[in-house]
């Protein structure tokens, strides 16, 4: 095997500087279990218990998206008003979940769902819809509430 004298001289020159071979820095493994243990400890301090029978959970966001947990674990501490939902969420549009949600809703929620469907068709964001309905409800509800400014409570009928 022919050896190039220039390469050999270059290698000998650089070998005087090197003590060891090239080292690849090992990647640091970040364990997510540590975060879970902290969560479990915090829930243990609150005396949270596992709630059975919850098959799925949906969290409605202000931007119209829904966080859907298909297989969910629920732990709750009602005394401290704390509930933990664990699992892998899927971000979906509300239109994808309407067939699954309809049987679970009561009569009072169907009106809200109808308004939400109209609002989606109109192209508004749910945030705009919520502020508009809150303002309309405040205006409509203000008719039967008397003004009590600069009056005594006993004088107002």
From Swiss-Prot:
Q: Where is this region: Disordered?
A: 1-28, 124-157
**What residues does the NAC-A/B domain cover?**
33-98
Protein name (database record): Nascent polypeptide-associated complex subunit beta
Quote the SMART domains the UniProt record gives.
NAC
- Protein keywords: Cytoplasm, Nucleus, Protein transport, Repressor, Transcription, Transcription regulation, Transport
| Record InterPro entries | BTF3, NAC_A/B_dom_sf, Nas_poly-pep-assoc_cplx_dom
Protein localization: Cytoplasm; Nucleus
Q: Which family does it belong to?
A: Belongs to the NAC-beta family.
Q: Which PANTHER family match?
A: TRANSCRIPTION FACTOR BTF3 FAMILY MEMBER
- How does the annotation summarize its subunit structure? Part of the nascent polypeptide-associated complex (NAC), consisting of EGD2 and EGD1. NAC associates with ribosomes via EGD1.
Record's function text: Component of the nascent polypeptide-associated complex (NAC), a dynamic component of the ribosomal exit tunnel, protecting the emerging polypeptides from interaction with other cytoplasmic proteins to ensure appropriate nascent protein targeting. The NAC complex also promotes mitochondrial protein import by enhancing productive ribosome interactions with the outer mitochondrial membrane and blocks the inappropriate interaction of ribosomes translating non-secretory nascent polypeptides with translocation sites in the membrane of the endoplasmic reticulum.
Nucleotide-binding among keywords: no
A Gene Ontology term for the protein's cellular component: cytosol
Q: Pfam families recorded for this chain?
A: NAC
Q: Where are the transmembrane segments?
A: none
Keyword Thylakoid included in the entry's annotation: no
Per the UniProt entry, what is one GO biological process? protein transport
Gene3D superfamilies the record matches: Nascent polypeptide-associated complex domain
């Amino acid at each position: 095997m022919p050896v190039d004298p220039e390469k050999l001289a270059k290698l000998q020159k650089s070998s005087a500087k090197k003590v060891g071979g090239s080292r690849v820095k090992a990647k640091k493994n970040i364990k997510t279990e540590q975060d879970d243990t902290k969560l479990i400890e915090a829930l243990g301090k609150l005396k949270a218990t596992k709630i059975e029978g919850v098959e799925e959970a949906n969290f409605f966001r202000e931007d119209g998206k829904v966080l859907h947990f298909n297989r969910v674990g629920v732990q709750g501490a009602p005394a401290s008003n704390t509930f933990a939902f664990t699992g892998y969420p899927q971000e979906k549009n509300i239109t994808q979940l309407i067939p699954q949600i309809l049987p679970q809703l009561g009569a009072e929620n169907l009106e809200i769902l109808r308004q939400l469907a109209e609002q989606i068709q109109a192209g508004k964001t749910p945030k705009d819809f919520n502020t508009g309905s809150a303002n309309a409800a405040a205006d409509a509800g203000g008719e039967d509430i008397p003004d009590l400014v600069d009056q005594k409570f006993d004088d107002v009928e």
